[in-house]
Every structure is written in C-alpha cells, then in structure tokens.
Amino acid sequence: MLATDSDPIVAIATASGRGGIGVVRLSLGRAGEAAARALSDALCGARLMPRHASYVPFLDGAGEPLDRGIALYFPAPHSYTGEHVIELQGHGGPIVLQLLLQRCLDAGRAHGLRLAEPGEFTRRAFLNDKLDLAQAEAVADLIEASSEAAARSAGRSLDGAFSRDIHALVDDVIALRMLVEATLDFPEEEIDFLEAADARGKLAHIRERLAHVLGDARQGALLREGLSVVLAGQPNVGKSSLLNALAGAELAIVTPIAGTTRDKVAQTIQIEGIPLHIIDTAGLRETEDEVEKIGIARTWGEIERADVVLHLLDARSGLGPGDEAIAARFPDGVPVVRVLNKTDLTGAPASVTRTGGGAARADVCEVRLSAKRGDGIDLLRGELLRIAGWQAGAESVYLARERHLIALRAAQAHLARAAEHAEQNAQALDLFAEELRLAQERLNSITGEFTSDDLLGVIFSRFCIGK
C-alpha cells in the first residue's frame, strides 16, 4: 500500500458533459469522521445523517447556494471504498459541477483533500477488502461493456461468480497441499500417501474443475476483447462489399475500379454479443503507385496482427496464381477462411466446406457467398463464431481478461507437472508439493492475494476518474 492510499480524495463521479444529474464523490481516508462532520457543515450547512438522503443546498465559501440536491453520507466501513464517503448529487451541468468540485477542495484543504486519480475509489475498495481484484476489474469492464452479453457477464464477475470459482479451486489445492506437507513432515509413518489419501484422484478433480473455469474464462475474454478479422485479397474481389454486408451499412466505397481502397477501413460489429473488429484493406497486387504501395504494406501489417483472415477470391475464377502467392505469405498460426465471393454471377448456392488441417497455418474452411445479394453472409458469421470458439448459450459466463487467462494456463501447467510427479510416488513428493504451491500462487494472483503494486497501478490507471 502506498502512503497516498489514505489521502482524502474527491472527484466528479459522473461522465463529462451535460446531464440531468451530476455526482461529486468524496472518500475521506485517514481524515475520517472528523472531516466528514466538518465537510457536511461547510458544504451543506447541516450535519448529514448516516445512510439518509438529505435534500440540501450546496454552499459556496460565502454560504451562498451553488446548487441544491441530494447529499448522502456513508460512514466507514459501510461504503463503496470502506472509508467515510460523502456523495453530492446535483444537476449535471459541467460548470456547476466544476464549481462544486473546487468548493470541496477549498473546504477540505485543511484535511489534505486532493483530486482523485483514475480508478482510485475502486483501488481503495480493493485495498479495504470491499472487492477482490477480479471484482474491481469487473467494475471497469461493466462500464466499458459494448454488448448486453458483455454487460451481463461483467455483472456476474462483479457479483463474485468468477472469484468464487477461483477461491473454490484454491481451497481444494490448499487441502491437497496440507496432506502432502503432513506426509513430508512425518516420513517415519511410512504410509503410501498417494494411495491412502487418493491424492491422484483429488488432483484429477482439481484439474477437471480448472479446465472448466478456463473454458468459461476464454468465453468471457472473447466477449471483452472480440476478434480481429482482416479482409484480404486481390483488388476488385469484393472486400469492401463484404465489409458493408457484414456491417449492414455502406461504410466502404464500392466501385468497379481496381485499387479503390488504398487504406484500411475499420468497423466493429457484433455477432451474438461478440465484438468483431473488421478491417477492409487495400487490394494485394504489384503496383507502381506509391500511395497504393503504402496501403498494401499496411495491409500486410494488419494481416500479421489478425485473429482471422478472410481471403477473398472471385468465385468465377477461383484460386489463381496471384491468389496462391498471397496465400503463401499468410503468417503461420492465423486461421484463414477462403471466401469465394460473387456467387450471384455463377449461379452456385451459398455453402460452407470445412477444410481445416493439422498445419500451423491452414485454411480452416471455404465459404461461397454473394456479398452483393447477402447470400451466405449468415454462414460466414457462423464460421467466424466457430473459429473464435464461441459456444451458444455461453452468455452465462463471467467476463475475463488476458491476464486471467495467463494465470489460469500457468496454474494448469503446474498441476500437469504435479500429476507427472505423482506417478513417481514418494520419490518426488517434495516436487509434487512445490507444483501445488506454484499453482495456488497463480490462482491467487487473479483475485489479488499476491499482486505487486506495479500491477495494481496499471490496472487501476485504466479506470475513469471518479470510479
């Protein structure tokens, strides 16, 4: 904990701009109840009753009203931050809110009141055990949710669903560790611990539960992060038309002139609540046009960063030499969907053919469609969800972040090594115990039991001020 984590702080807690209601929030830290009484008198002209809504004037330094509204006082520890908290709910004009904020700073100067940093209220809720770290992150995720599914999943994380699953796993690991440590402490008993305590069975159960939690976390991360989809191919194969068809709007210019798109056009759409970040790129070809060359170089940069590449071809000609040269340059490890567009000119029906192989970079499927008529667009959407790993009905999962996935995978690896040591019976019991300890440490990092101040600084700096 930093020394400044106990400073009294204040901030405007509502979004910038005009609105019906604006909120100024104070969390009084070490200044405590004495500051709460003094600020109640100075700002509202009255002593605020705990947990009661009081309709009062908000006073300036001369005792004149700046505004009138609702004042709320939450004594510690029964508040969002776990500290003494005052909230002033007035009208949402930016000028009156700035005046009220400055008045709070002036009135609280003797108590060391300062402006809050981004995420500092939620950081204090974490430090004062009102939220664990996964729940604190869910606050920001709920605010930033881009779909109903993401909002509901963030709400479940905030309610503690993710944390409860993690704590249950940790409890099981601790219980198994206790048995192992007891056996290491009393080797003279000569008991076959692994058999007597069914350690292998207990470990298998923990690994199975962890795999389930990791699967749910992957779904939640997909809701939060989405999928980057790059449209690539030669000029005039219908990339811009496909972007417009997927987005349901005319976002990109479509002409019969090759090379119309010279720079990327990006649009985020949603499919079943999953954000798809679709990028239409310049057509890939040999050219002497310097501007087009820059666009083509950027196209390859986007392809390198993509989660999925849609390789567009003209259904009339199929895969030609130029297309083969493009396909050969696609990076390993990036799924490629071969899209044969313009089926309206061939008379062929829309269809999907699964072609996935075992190579590091393989065409996972082939979709025949008409971007112009919309035939087969739903088939393509379905394939994108399948490639992303989205499971129908997975909206009940909790929202997760990349750091959670990293920690879960690391814990999974430690438990896998523990299982290997278990096969060596008592000869590797100390290594078995160590892998359990490391798995527990990685799981605890998710909820914040073992977390550095540097990581906390990064996490909470991404919040808005006043939250």
UniProtKB/Swiss-Prot annotation:
One of its GO terms (biological process) is tRNA wobble uridine modification. The keyword Cytoplasm applies. GO terms for molecular function: GTP binding; GTPase activity; metal ion binding. The keyword GTP-binding applies. Its cofactor is K(+). Binds 1 potassium ion per subunit. It is an enzyme of class 3 (hydrolase). SUPFAM superfamilies: P-loop containing nucleoside triphosphate hydrolases, TrmE connector domain. Gene3D superfamilies: P-loop containing nucleotide triphosphate hydrolases (3.40.50.300), Probable tRNA modification gtpase trme, domain 1 (3.30.1360.120), tRNA modification GTPase MnmE domain 2 (1.20.120.430). Pfam families: MMR_HSR1, MnmE_helical, TrmE_N. InterPro entries: G_TrmE, GTP-bd, GTP-bd_TrmE_N, GTPase_MnmE, MnmE_dom2, MnmE_helical, P-loop_NTPase, Small_GTP-bd. Coiled coil: none annotated. GO terms for cellular component: cytosol. Its EC number is 3.6.-.-. It is found in: Cytoplasm. (6S)-5-formyl-5,6,7,8-tetrahydrofolate binds at residues 25, 87, 130, 467. Residues 226-389 form the TrmE-type G domain. GTP binds at residues 236-241, 255-261, 280-283. Exhibits a very high intrinsic GTPase hydrolysis rate. Involved in the addition of a carboxymethylaminomethyl (cmnm) group at the wobble position (U34) of certain tRNAs, forming tRNA-cmnm(5)s(2)U34. HAMAP family: GTPase_MnmE. Homodimer. Heterotetramer of two MnmE and two MnmG subunits. This is tRNA modification GTPase MnmE. It comes from Burkholderia pseudomallei (strain 1710b). The lineage of its organism: Bacteria, Pseudomonadati, Pseudomonadota, Betaproteobacteria, Burkholderiales. The gene is mnmE.
